[in-house]
């Protein structure tokens, strides 16, 4: 296979964009395990003066990710994130105004390999979110295990991430006076195993917890489709029933997160590596589904609202797919 190298005379702006995405990918993949490893080494080598104060801090701070987190405007405003956004580039599209006196749950689809569009649009401060949705604060919910990693948890909270636990989502959408948007990548880790270019498979039919929370607190539901998310990486073929998929499913059940076998490009060549491809991401925010507060929703009410959500999600995809290069015959597969 002939290796296609990146040209040497690339503009500085593009080099900065590459650096911004590279650091994000490396942090996404390595910072959590590294922080655990460093903590273990400190304990093994008896650096009490370092790890004892931090473990005490963890004890008192353990539930912060379920109470809105601890974001840092300074970190969220790093110029680094502008270069990150411009690399793809990432776009946010609004289809309807939202009322800032209410709280909302955004269902983000698809997960892709790393949910790049969710992070770029709803976590750091260089998307058009503040202009499109004035009066709102967005909170991107991620797996609770992200907050089990010492030090790493402080970093992910600083960029606005919070836990996706029931307690955390309920806390955000029960805010008096509204103005909160909880962004949940509903397909989760399981959906990343179906993140193949040109495919639109969403794991949603069994995801009903967000519907119950919406009913309990009267939070409106909003489907969000991120076109281009599945084009950022290539993944090893892993159809249902294959030995690769069987192993991946078992590991996902054991560990709580998936291990897709993916690749894209490198820093200095375009053939192989863990850098994402330069593919545009268009994240389209759909119409809100009004939800009447029901403190003790029945299963029938949950099923009805869940069905309405899936119908609105499908409509959103069909209405906008042509604008972003999706063939007319392609449709969503809801699992």
From Swiss-Prot:
GO biological-process terms attached to the record: diacylglycerol biosynthetic process; glycerol metabolic process; triglyceride biosynthetic process
Which reaction does this enzyme catalyse, per its entry?
Answer: a 2-acylglycerol + an acyl-CoA = a 1,2-diacylglycerol + CoA; 2-(9Z-octadecenoyl)-glycerol + butanoyl-CoA = 1-butanoyl-2-(9Z-octadecenoyl)-glycerol + CoA; 2-(9Z-octadecenoyl)-glycerol + octanoyl-CoA = 1-octanoyl-2-(9Z-octadecenoyl)-glycerol + CoA; 2-(9Z-octadecenoyl)-glycerol + dodecanoyl-CoA = 1-dodecanoyl-2-(9Z-octadecenoyl)-glycerol + CoA
* Xref: CDD domains: LPLAT_MGAT-like
Classify the source by domain of life.
Answer: Eukaryota
EC annotation?
Answer: 2.3.1.22
**Cystine bridges: which residues?**
none
Q: In which tissues is it expressed?
A: Expressed in stomach and liver.
Q: Name one Pfam family in it.
A: DAGAT
Transmembrane stretches in the record are 18-38, 40-60, 132-152
Subcellular location per UniProt equals:
Endoplasmic reticulum membrane
InterPro entries from the UniProt entry: DAGAT
Q: What is the uppermost EC class here?
A: transferase
List all annotated glycosylation positions: 121, 125, 180
Q: What are the recorded GO MF terms, alphabetically?
A: 2-acylglycerol O-acyltransferase activity; diacylglycerol O-acyltransferase activity
In what pathway does it function?
A: Glycerolipid metabolism; triacylglycerol biosynthesis
Report the family membership: Belongs to the diacylglycerol acyltransferase family.
Chain's role: Involved in glycerolipid synthesis and lipid metabolism. Catalyzes the formation of diacylglycerol, the precursor of triacylglycerol, by transferring the acyl chain of a fatty acyl-CoA to a monoacylglycerol, mainly at the sn-1 or sn-3 positions. It uses both sn-2-monoacylglycerol (2-acylglycerol) and sn-1-monoacylglycerol (1-acyl-sn-glycerol) equally well as substrates, and uses sn-3-monoacylglycerol (3-acyl-sn-glycerol) with lower efficiency. Probably not involved in absorption of dietary fat in the small intestine.
Kindly provide the name given to this protein in its UniProt entry. 2-acylglycerol O-acyltransferase 1
